[in-house]
UniProtKB/Swiss-Prot annotation:
It comes from Haemophilus influenzae (strain ATCC 51907 / DSM 11121 / KW20 / Rd). This is Lipopolysaccharide export system permease protein LptF. One of its GO terms (biological process) is transmembrane transport. PANTHER family: LIPOPOLYSACCHARIDE EXPORT SYSTEM PERMEASE PROTEIN LPTF, SLR0882 PROTEIN-RELATED. The lineage of its organism: Bacteria, Pseudomonadati, Pseudomonadota, Gammaproteobacteria, Pasteurellales. The chain crosses the membrane at residues 16-36, 54-74, 101-121, 266-286, 296-316, 325-345. The gene is lptF.
Amino acid sequence: MILIRYLIKEVFKSQIAILLILLLIFFSQQFVRVLGAAANGNVPADLVFSLLGLGMPTMAQLMLPLCLFIAILLTFGRLYAESEITVMRACGVGQRILVKVALIMSLLTAGIAAYNALWLSPWAIQKQVNMVEDAKANPTVGVLSSGQFISTNNNNVVLFIDKIKDNQIRNVYLFQMTPQKQTKPSVITAEKGELIALPNGDQVLNLKNTKRVEGTSALPDFRITHFDEYHAYLGYQSAENTNDEVAELTLSQLIDLDSSSAKAELHWRITLILAVPLMALIAVPLSRVNPRQGRFAKILPALLLYLIYFLLQSSFKSAGSAGKLEAELLMPLVNIGFFLLAVVLNSWDSEIMYKFRYLFSKKGSAKDDKYP
């Protein structure tokens, strides 16, 4: 029991350190992407950090299996290189204790991965989409962009701003496209103004030095009015989420849907959970190194095996979403194949495997004697 606690402690310390490093790498990559989208006007600037925070669960989907996989490789590899595991085996401790430690750590990590993949990530993705759509439908001064036409109030009002300086909008053009009650279509111009958000979510555009031209091209009775200060009520536009991405759907919604994309997404989420114990089991035999080789001797082939697993699953998910392949059949087969690989690798030095290896080597030598 003391030995198990020691090994778990060592793996856990490595896992936390690797998780922080991966978090920094993924966060920096996501920050550059969101910042670029904000610079292009695709994402409101004041939502950058909110979107980054909501993007953390999605980033954690791939980080959780990877950090445990690398932690087991590095920790057990160091113990092999320093001959600690050799001493353990000399005292009668075999491969089972390493597998047991890997399973304990993988079950704890898989629990977090399950909560993240099945509930937290879909909620965060849906929240991201709703925030962006709502900000586009009901812009504030912080998210307004100069030189762009902005539709508000269910496309009845179009706003154009020439400049934004010191939280003030300059050279404002407000187009009321459709008649409202006794009011004809109009164009409002102003030197400057500000957008005020009311507590109930409605918005009021406060304009100064304003001129309003009201009328239609069909009738010559145009009305021109000058205002020192003009308040335009923009109201609140409910954002309609037309995005049908299955990544936003909850677990119950995915199960109820019968589409190929929903099935592929469901099996992808299951894969993100099963990948934790599968990769942990595979990491145990791959961490075994000769003390002269160093602890990093098998890092590259282990990472290649990890990449092959996720590339296969990602390819089957994409093809399944497009309806080209049956993801619900192929993705579980990959999991079964890697599970069998983990069993074979972990039992390679067992008595049963020794018998099989001896049997095949004996057959091979017999063939060599028969055909010299």
